């Protein structure tokens, strides 16, 4: 923790610098950042799992306590208003006592509706950052999530501090242990539900603590891109396993995917080809490279795989130009990663929030930025047998280029995705996922 504490001091200094700069530009006195409030289920007395405002947890790892507030102006010591009610029904969060607390002036709040007593007296020139605009209005904030402030912060969130990079390494290290446990469970005959339990146990996090709903897909379920159901029964014949699962550390996410074949066969060879292609794409990452160019390079590699594995005929560029590769690889190559799994800033050209749209032919690409040092991105090429997309090819002449017999043979395996989390450095790439123990 000493290393993290050392990096944290510089992290807070950088956040204060960013705040001071945008406040000066926008002639604001400061920012009031709300952690959030509980959300009650409809017609019930149970709350949905609480998720803290990412702008709040960028400053400190208070992740599970609603009704907290940060008051920052880039000059003075940030003020943390920490919610600690008198409550005999629920566990009350302990007063923080960690390496980061020395950087905050901490005040305790016992009643959520009394927060105005601890906030700046005149909020007219302060900006509220958070979800609950009705609360902000009652408290007198006329500036609520102002575009100029949000665009500036989102643009700079893509450049990670050393503290953030270390948190993300630890999130990867934790997730790798879960992936290894899940892989072992798959080869030992576990069901999707059982594999999920092995994963969560290995990472030591609950379903509400991991950064997103795990994808644990056996056989043809791997063709469903965001498959989050969990079958309790093992399939009669075990063919393949796709796992897309991450872990959290101090609010930062990892997002890792692997695909396995149960036996050595043609599908296993296709996984090996995808693994090779993914590593080649990662080698292409460097400052100054346009992320959409990496996405287009992925389609070229997918096209070659379609030809090599007798899934399609023709020439590779023609398969891309006709949209045939998009039927087999319909999603983007990856996205920014950080406080959120699909982190903000992926389309921002500048601090003003100028939007760089995804290419028209690739609308699901989540990042159009030019790569720069200390950015963290996922790299997740895939190839799937998705009938709804392939049926579109059958409706025109493109269907004549598809070897439907090979498609039928691979359909029971679902699909392949391989995903690593990569830091772009000035002179190298740091593949956190592989370097921390998940070689394949």
Curated annotation (Swiss-Prot):
Enzyme superclass (EC): hydrolase
E.C. number: 3.4.13.9
Cofactor dependence: Mn(2+)
Residues annotated as binding Mn(2+) 2: 244, 255, 419
Catalyses which reaction(s): Xaa-L-Pro dipeptide + H2O = an L-alpha-amino acid + L-proline
Residue numbers binding Mn(2+) 1: 255, 335, 380, 419
Pfam families (UniProt xref): PepQ_N, Peptidase_M24
Superkingdom, taxonomy of origin: Bacteria
Record's keyword terms, sorted: Dipeptidase, Hydrolase, Manganese, Metal-binding, Metalloprotease, Protease
Family note: Belongs to the peptidase M24B family. Bacterial-type prolidase subfamily.
Free-text function comment from the UniProt entry: Splits dipeptides with a prolyl residue in the C-terminal position.
Protein name: Xaa-Pro dipeptidase
Taxonomy of the source species: Bacteria, Pseudomonadati, Pseudomonadota, Gammaproteobacteria, Alteromonadales
């Amino acid at each position: 923790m000493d290393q993290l504490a050392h990096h944290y001091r510089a992290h807070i200094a950088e956040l204060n610098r960013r705040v001071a700069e945008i406040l000066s530009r926008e002639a604001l006195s400061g920012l009031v950042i709300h952690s959030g409030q509980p959300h009650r289920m409809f017609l019930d007395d149970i709350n949905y799992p609480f998720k803290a405002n990412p702008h709040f947890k960028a400053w400190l790892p208070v992740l599970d306590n609603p009704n907290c507030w940060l008051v920052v102006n880039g000059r003075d010591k940030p003020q943390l208003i920490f919610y600690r009610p008198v409550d005999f029904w629920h566990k009350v969060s302990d007063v923080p006592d960690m390496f980061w607390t020395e950087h905050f002036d901490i005040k305790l709040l016992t009643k959520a509706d009394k927060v105005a007593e601890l906030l700046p007296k005149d909020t007219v020139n302060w900006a509220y950052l958070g979800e609950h605009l009705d609360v902000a209005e009652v408290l007198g904030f006329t500036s609520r999530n102002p575009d100029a402030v949000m665009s500036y912060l989102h643009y700079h969130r893509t450049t990670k501090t050393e503290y953030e990079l270390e948190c993300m390494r630890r999130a990867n290290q934790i997730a790798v242990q879960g992936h290894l446990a899940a892989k072992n469970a798959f080869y030992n005959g576990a069901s999707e539900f059982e594999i999920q339990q092995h994963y969560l146990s290995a990472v030591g996090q609950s379903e509400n603590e991991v950064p997103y709903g795990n994808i644990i897909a056996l056989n043809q379920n791997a063709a469903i891109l965001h498959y989050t159901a969990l079958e309790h029964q093992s399939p009669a014949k075990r063919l393949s396993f796709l796992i897309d699962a991450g872990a959290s550390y101090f609010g930062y996410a990892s997002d890792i995917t692997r695909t396995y074949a149960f036996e050595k066969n043609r599908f296993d060879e296709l996984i090996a080809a995808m693994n090779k292609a993914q590593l080649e794409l990662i080698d292409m990452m460097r400052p100054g490279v346009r992320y959409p160019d990496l996405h287009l390079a992925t389609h070229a590699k997918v096209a070659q795989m379609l030809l090599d594995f007798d899934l399609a005929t023709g020439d590779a560029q023609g398969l891309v130009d006709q949209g045939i590769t998009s039927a087999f690889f319909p999603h983007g190559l990856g996205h920014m990663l950080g406080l959120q799994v699909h982190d903000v800033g992926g389309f921002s050209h500048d601090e003003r929030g100028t939007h760089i749209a995804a290419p028209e032919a690739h609308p699901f690409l989540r990042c159009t930025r030019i790569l720069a040092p200390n950015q963290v991105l996922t790299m997740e090429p895939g190839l799937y047998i998705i009938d709804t997309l392939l049926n579109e090819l059958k409706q025109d002449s493109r269907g004549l280029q598809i070897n439907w017999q090979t498609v039928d043979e691979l359909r029971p395996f679902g699909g392949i995705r391989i995903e690593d989390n990569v830091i772009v450095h000035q002179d190298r790439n740091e593949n956190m996922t592989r370097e921390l123990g998940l070689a394949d």
